[in-house]
């Protein structure tokens, strides 16, 4: 026992060295450890021999335990002996330096051999710690994954595909309602019908399908995140998984499926069915719960949405539907929302007649200028007391000189008068008009019609007017009474079947009789400029009476002096040519009219085929280019170019044509009574051919009448002498060389008497 104590004292004395009279204890290391958690970065664990395993090039907190450590000036690391130390850690880097503990930070370099600790003090120099439990092995960290990297990459590609499919189906399939699929199955192309038929059965289970694709999408995205976390750590795994899911799992598939969702959904329908089968225990109860509380997926397209869809198609250039067809469809859809008030013509714009007016030329002119065929008739001067209707057809047998009043004609025909409420729907009124009894109705204020018709129009909704057509007519018909004061109403407008048709077609209808059109859509009044004015209505050109003998003789003399074309014309044909082509212009100006009516005989730039000779009255010549106006009186002719062309053609022994014309550079108008001779190219050519034929049959001719008994023909000469009353013509007349074809005349005519019908 005494020996053991002595040996320990010797050992202790061996560790105590005196330097300059100072005792120093030799540093002793009892252990080394990493002062951080086991899972901390850099510490990997312990080796088979008990050495510390740290990650190479990773800074760790190294703790050295023992006693006598306060005199340590430096800590070095070596792989063999202290003389060949590779790294040194000075005392200045110790952030804990005590007698029993030294702590500092250090990053070890990867090395095949473990690093050994060497301590250096002032008295003892380098002291190597050979305990293998104090060794530190720096190794390169190797991350172990769940499975090989190539397998994880393949699984990631598969998961990204499934994620993209689920995201696309969520938008593509759920955007197509069962109603839209049903429409495609009936009216789509062959490919659309096939795809819609494949999707329709599972799309009917909308909530269950929605739960399936959403749950699968969440599961797959979670798997993608886990695999990325296994392949990489920290920020890299987060960024990679986020970018991959957003770009490849959401944006790209949804941008494709929003346009081709039908085709994608149909071609991947077997995958969708597999997912629905796989998740059936989860999605079936969820779908039932959603069906009960969220409702079944039923899309009902109301009228307003359908109208807006049609309007959007009108603005789309790729729409293959005709624009007019879309307008009609929109008009039909919006017709039920409109009432009579929205379509009617305002009462101030309605053309009416007083029953006291006389049907003279002035009134007839107003009626014709209006362009209307049904005209309301009011009592006295009160336009609010409309008592009857006047149809233009009622005036067919009434002359403008009979001075019959409007009241007499209206009461005789007793046309049906209809007064409707301004809030009456157009559909109800159109049902009445379709009966055919009337196509025009007066519109009264709503409160007054309701008052007299027992509240049949209590509200303006369509439902209140869904009645039988005849019942509706009886409920709203204004009774024909002698005293209309018993049912006073305030008229606000007029409506016709044409107004309703225009709303249906979404276009204004203008026929050939429209002069003033009230455009209800644009609220403008348009004027039909192609219609004649009232002053021109009774300006007419017609055939006149025959000329007197004196006037006829003067006309013949003037024509014979004007051109030799008439010189050798048959007298009877010449006389008929004149008498049968006398025309006159009659002008009946409206009463109180400041501008007289005019009639154009020639228009500048418009070809004409007639020759005119004014016999009575005056005409006005206007040269538009030079802005010159002249008045001409009797014995002024126009269209001489036609006679000159005819004369030149005959003198050249050519067959004249009825196609001769001349192009005036002036306007010839008549503003008062005028009588003139009109010779057209056809009538002139006819008279010349008659004259030629008469001349031919009056020349001696030999004709074979019969054979005698000896077989030789008997010749008979017949000479037609000229009439003693025939006029002597100039021998220089062009008719001496007249050679007109007479093929159109009857071949059997042999005498002048038989020519009388043609000459007439």
UniProtKB/Swiss-Prot annotation:
Residues 22-153, 230, 283-760 are extracellular. This is Metal transporter cnnm-2. Residues 708-734 are annotated as: Disordered. Keywords: Cell membrane, Glycoprotein, Ion transport, Membrane, Signal, Transmembrane, Transmembrane helix, Transport. InterPro entries: ACDP (IPR045095), CBS_dom_sf (IPR046342), CNNM (IPR002550), Ion_transp-like_CBS (IPR044751). It is a multi-pass membrane protein. The keyword Aminoacyl-tRNA synthetase does not apply. It is found in: Cell membrane. The chain crosses the membrane at residues 154-174, 209-229, 231-251, 262-282.
């Amino acid at each position: 026992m005494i020996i053991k104590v002595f040996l320990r004292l010797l050992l202790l004395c061996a560790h105590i060295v005196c330097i300059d009279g100072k005792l120093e204890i030799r540093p002793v290391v009892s252990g080394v450890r990493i002062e951080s958690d086991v899972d901390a970065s850099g510490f990997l664990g312990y080796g088979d021999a008990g050495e510390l395993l740290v990650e190479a090039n990773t800074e760790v907190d190294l703790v050295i335990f023992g006693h006598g450590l306060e005199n340590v000036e430096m800590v070095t690391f070596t792989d063999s002996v202290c003389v060949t130390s590779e790294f040194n850690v000075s005392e200045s880097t110790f952030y804990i330096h005590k007698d029993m503990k030294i702590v500092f930070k250090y990053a070890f370099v990867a090395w095949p051999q473990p690093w050994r600790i060497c301590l250096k003090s002032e008295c003892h120099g380098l002291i190597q710690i050979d305990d293998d439990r104090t060794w530190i092995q720096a190794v390169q960290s190797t991350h172990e994954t769940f499975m090989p990297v190539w397998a994880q990459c393949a699984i990631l590609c598969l998961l990204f595909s499934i994620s993209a499919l689920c995201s696309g189906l969520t938008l593509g399939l759920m955007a197509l309602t069962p109603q839209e699929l049903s429409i495609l199955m009936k009216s789509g192309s062959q490919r659309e019908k096939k795809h819609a038929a494949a999707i329709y059965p599972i799309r009917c289970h909308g909530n269950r399908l929605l739960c399936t694709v959403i749950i699968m999408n969440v599961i797959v995205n979670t798997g993608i995140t886990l695999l990325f976390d296994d392949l990489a750590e920290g920020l890299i795994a987060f960024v990679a998984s986020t970018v991959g899911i957003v770009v490849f799992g959401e944006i790209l598939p949804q941008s494709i499926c929003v346009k081709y969702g039908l085709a994608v959904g149909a071609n991947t329908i077997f995958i969708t069915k597999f997912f629905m089968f796989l998740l059936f225990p989860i999605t079936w109860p969820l779908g039932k719960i959603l069906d009960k509380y969220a409702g079944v997926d039923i899309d009902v397209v109301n009228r307003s949405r359908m109208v807006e869809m049609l309007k959007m198609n009108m603005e789309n250039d790729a729409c293959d539907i005709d624009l007019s067809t879309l307008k009609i469809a929109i008009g039909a859809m919006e017709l039920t929302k409109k009432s009579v008030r929205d379509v009617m013509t305002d009462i101030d714009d309605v053309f009416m007649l007083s029953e006291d007016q006389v049907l003279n030329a002035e009134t007839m002119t107003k009626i014709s200028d209006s362009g209307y065929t049904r005209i309301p008739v009011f009592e006295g001067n009160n336009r609010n007391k409309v008592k009857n209707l006047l149809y233009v057809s009622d005036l067919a047998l009434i002359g403008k000189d009979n001075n019959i009043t409007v009241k007499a004609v209206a009461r005789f025909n007793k046309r049906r008068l209809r007064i409707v409420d301004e809030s009456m729907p157009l559909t109800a009124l159109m049902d009445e008009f379709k009966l055919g009894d009337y196509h025009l109705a007066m519109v009264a204020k709503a409160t007054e019609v309701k008052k007299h018709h027992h509240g049949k129009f209590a509200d303006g909704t369509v439902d209140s007017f869904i009645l039988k057509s005849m019942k509706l007519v009886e409920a709203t018909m204004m009774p024909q009474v002698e005293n209309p004061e018993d049912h006073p109403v305030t008229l606000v407008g007029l409506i016709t079947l044409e107004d309703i048709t225009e709303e249906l077609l979404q276009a204004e209808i203008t026929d050939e009789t429209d002069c003033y059109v009230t455009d209800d859509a644009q609220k403008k009044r348009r004027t039909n400029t192609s219609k004649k004015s009232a002053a021109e209505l009774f300006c007419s050109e017609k055939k006149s009476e025959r000329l007197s003998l004196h006037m006829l003789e003067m006309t013949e003399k003037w024509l014979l002096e004007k051109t030799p074309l008439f010189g050798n014309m048959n007298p009877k044909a010449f006389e008929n040519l004149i008498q049968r082509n006398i025309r006159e212009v009659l002008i009946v100006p409206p009463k109180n009219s400041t501008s007289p009516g005019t009639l154009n005989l020639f228009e500048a730039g418009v070809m004409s085929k007639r020759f005119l000779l004014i016999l009575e009255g005056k005409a006005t010549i206007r040269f538009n280019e030079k802005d010159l106006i002249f008045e001409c009186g009797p014995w002024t002719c126009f269209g001489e170019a036609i006679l000159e062309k005819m004369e030149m053609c005959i003198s050249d022994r050519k067959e004249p044509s009825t196609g001769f014309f001349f192009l005036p550079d002036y306007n010839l108008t008549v503003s008062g009574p005028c009588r003139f001779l009109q010779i057209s190219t056809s009538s002139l050519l006819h008279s010349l051919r008659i004259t030629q034929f008469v001349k031919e049959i009056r020349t001696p001719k030999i004709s074979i009448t019969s054979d005698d008994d000896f077989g030789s023909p008997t010749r008979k000469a017949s000479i037609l002498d000229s009439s003693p009353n025939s006029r002597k013509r100039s021998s220089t007349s062009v008719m001496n060389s007249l050679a007109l074809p007479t093929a159109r005349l009857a071949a059997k005519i042999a005498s002048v008497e038989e020519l009388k019908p043609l000459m007439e």
